């Protein structure tokens, strides 16, 4: 009896062992048993996301408390860019990159660039005392944050509203040319001021011509280059000889139009006669040399190109912003807490070039201020360039990304795809800009775009396990190999939820960053900031007659040249559409 029970138990044990072996064997030789886990020693790549310890060593963790900040309490001492956050209940901790960096944010439409990224960063800028400039296509940033910055944080706020210029603060494009020309006229030995005036005149002319015609001119490049020189020349003449109230960009257009008329001397127009009154070494004469020495037809083409480029300024509303004093002062912007909001009209991209021009002028003036402070600003300055890919080409943007970082100027470019940058700056220019952006923040990928593929490639590959299973009648087998796999495939990137971004930083592992809606950060808005409509102001324009008198008074009449009788007179009746001059 005992022997039978023992035999039964032995049979049961053997059966269980056989069953376990069968199950184990079936799992081992199933494709589901081959897991794509990280293996090996990085033979096909070592990409991985940063761990919690690495994130804490890379970024500053700052308690985000806007309610206390707005009461002047617990203000953050670390200046930098907010790239992520951690939440425990209602407690929000911001991850701040405090290094001298530039950043490029790549996110499609509807990714939450404003509500998830810009609002927290503007709040942090205000609390940390950083001056900032931001472009704003919807007007939301100025509407919601200009009042907070001014009334709560004590910022000097300027709003350049290109959508509604009659409510905008002033922005005379010739302001810096006038400033340095006045300095030179007061001290004729100050050649540095004269050189700066000429430099800013060239920047204005190039930006104006490029914005209206693009960068590819082909066989017509002579006419556009000559038009740039002519506009530069007239800008310098306006700055040097015209009354202060007429020194603006619209006067440049009017003078070119006036100087097209015949001079009374066969074969020469008013422009040629006017420039001949200048000394041979005067730079205004040199800049216009390509235009005034050309044949009659070529010169007419150059003049028409110059006037066509300036047509964007012929707007009665826009004149109220362009023809009076400028509120923005670069030195004050760097030394005191200041905020500049540039509101762009979504329905009219022809005015976008003014942002490009403002960025160039501000950048160069910031370099001058930084040089006076030992090479670097004492207070960090931030440029948030939303829709950078939609703005006309910013000349020397590659140089800005290369050099501005060490001056404590951080540029945060926001684009919808890399293709936008490549369109404006070419393949090499785009590569230089991206190589000099120490932080890349990517998310909100379009299902049909190729940006996700580019970001996936940038993240690199990791080494994972793969294999195969073969089954015979009696001897199933399994083989395992190592292969490279993208850290995140394009499909995985495209399926990321709203508010989740990839943050890649130079010299660090990439990070999966979660940015919350501004309400979750504890951000609330006060009453919308509204600029009052200015009373219509009379615009005064420079006149060629007065300009000629000033030149003759300054330099006299050149030997062998006479003022042709009647040359100083103008028709009593102007042609329809011409601007009445103020003399």
Show where each model-derived region lies.
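Short intrinsically disordered, low-complexity coil segments enriched in acidic
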Residues: 2-6, 454-458, 508
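Conserved ATP-driven motor cores of ASCE-family P-loop NTPases powering translocation/secretion/packaging/pilus
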Residues: 401-502
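Basic- and hydrophobic-enriched, low-structure N-terminal and domain-boundary segments
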Residues: 1-111, 115-123, 128, 166, ...
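Short, exposed beta-strand "edge-strand" segments with a Pro/Gly-rich flavor and a Y/T-containing core
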Residues: 29-63, 89-90, 241-254, 314, ...
């Amino acid at each position: 009896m005992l022997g039978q029970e023992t035999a039964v138990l032995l049979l049961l044990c053997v059966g269980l062992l056989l069953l376990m072996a069968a199950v184990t064997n079936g799992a081992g030789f199933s494709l589901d048993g081959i897991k794509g886990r990280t293996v090996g020693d990085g033979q096909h790549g070592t990409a991985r996301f940063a761990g919690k310890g690495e994130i804490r060593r890379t970024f500053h963790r700052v308690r985000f408390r806007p309610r206390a900040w707005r009461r002047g309490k617990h203000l953050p001492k670390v200046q930098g860019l907010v790239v992520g956050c951690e939440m425990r209940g209602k407690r929000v901790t911001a991850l701040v990159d405090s290094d001298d960096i530039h950043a490029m944010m790549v996110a499609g439409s509807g990714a939450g660039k404003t509500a998830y990224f810009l609002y927290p960063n503007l709040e942090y800028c205000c609390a940390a005392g950083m001056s900032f400039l931001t472009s704003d296509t919807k007007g939301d940033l100025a509407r919601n944050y200009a009042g907070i910055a001014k009334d709560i944080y004590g910022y000097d706020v300027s709003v350049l509203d290109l959508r509604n210029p009659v409510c905008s603060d002033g922005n005379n494009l010739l302001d810096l040319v006038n400033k340095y020309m006045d300095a030179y006229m007061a001290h004729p030995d100050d050649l540095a001021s004269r050189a700066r005036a000429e430099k800013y005149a060239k920047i204005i002319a190039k930006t104006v011509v490029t914005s209206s015609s693009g960068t590819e001119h082909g066989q017509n490049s002579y006419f556009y280059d000559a038009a740039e020189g002519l506009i530069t020349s007239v800008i310098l003449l306006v700055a040097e000889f015209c009354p202060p109230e007429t020194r603006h960009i619209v006067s440049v257009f009017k003078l070119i139009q006036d100087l097209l008329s015949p001079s009374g001397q066969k074969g020469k127009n008013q422009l040629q006669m006017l420039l001949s009154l200048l000394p041979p070494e005067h730079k205004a004469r040199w800049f216009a040399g390509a235009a005034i020495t050309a044949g009659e037809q070529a010169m007419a083409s150059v003049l028409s190109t110059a006037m066509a480029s300036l047509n964007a300024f012929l707007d009665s509303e826009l004149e109220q912003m362009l023809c009076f004093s400028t509120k923005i002062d670069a030195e004050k912007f760097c030394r005191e807490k200041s905020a500049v909001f540039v509101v762009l009209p979504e329905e009219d991209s022809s005015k976008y070039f003014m942002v490009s021009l403002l960025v160039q002028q501000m950048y160069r003036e910031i370099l001058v201020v930084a040089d006076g402070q030992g090479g670097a600003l004492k207070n960090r300055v931030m440029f948030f360039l939303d829709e950078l890919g939609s703005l006309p080409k910013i000349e020397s943007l590659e140089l800005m990304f290369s050099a501005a970082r060490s001056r404590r100027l951080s540029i945060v470019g926001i684009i919808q795809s890399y293709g936008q940058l490549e369109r404006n700056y070419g393949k090499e220019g785009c590569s230089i800009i991206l190589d000099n952006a120490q932080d890349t923040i990517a998310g909100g990928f379009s299902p049909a775009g190729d940006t996700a593929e580019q970001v996936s490639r940038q993240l690199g590959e990791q080494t994972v396990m793969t294999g195969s299973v073969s089954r015979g009648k009696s001897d199933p087998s399994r083989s395992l190999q190592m292969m490279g796999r993208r850290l995140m495939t394009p499909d995985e990137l495209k399926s990321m939820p709203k508010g989740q971004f990839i943050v890649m930083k130079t010299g660090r592992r990439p990070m999966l960053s979660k940015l919350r809606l501004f309400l979750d950060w504890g951000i609330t808005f006060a009453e919308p900031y509204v600029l009052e409509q200015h009373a219509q102001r009379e615009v005064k324009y420079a006149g060629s007659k007065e300009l000629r008198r000033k030149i003759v008074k300054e330099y006299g009449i050149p030997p062998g040249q006479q003022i042709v009788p009647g040359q100083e007179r103008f028709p009593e009746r102007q042609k329809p559409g011409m601007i009445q001059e103020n003399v």
